[in-house]
């Protein structure tokens, strides 16, 4: 018997978003054609990109794939756990994954009551983020207080895998060199 969390898209959410984006596109078209100086802002292209991003986020299989990739990359990382995806129960509109039994990192007093060292926790979050970015080139790009939890045994557990980052080998090397420059106070490297 396993406890799971289920994320379900609201009924008609795609239709609602598309109607809003249609209105935004019309506004972008009007502004860009009436105020010539706004052409350089490429408002129509911005709305088109927003539509593409929104359509991807409306398919929960993409979020599941991102969570699964992070899970595979970090399954041996001490102190960091990603919820497992249950693919047999996941679809375009439904995401099924392990339930998080933890405390949000915004609940400082509750964390302290479990003897969680807040400064160490902050350091650990940064180290995990950088490890994922530099080692794997794939990282959770939305690690705010609402998306990070801590289990009773001190593991950091992220949720919401809709916004992820990817770095190619060259950018990972560049990031590592910048970080090394900061650590060594070699600001020419930075």
Predicted segments with their positions:
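Conserved catalytic cores of large enzyme domains
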Residues: 1-190
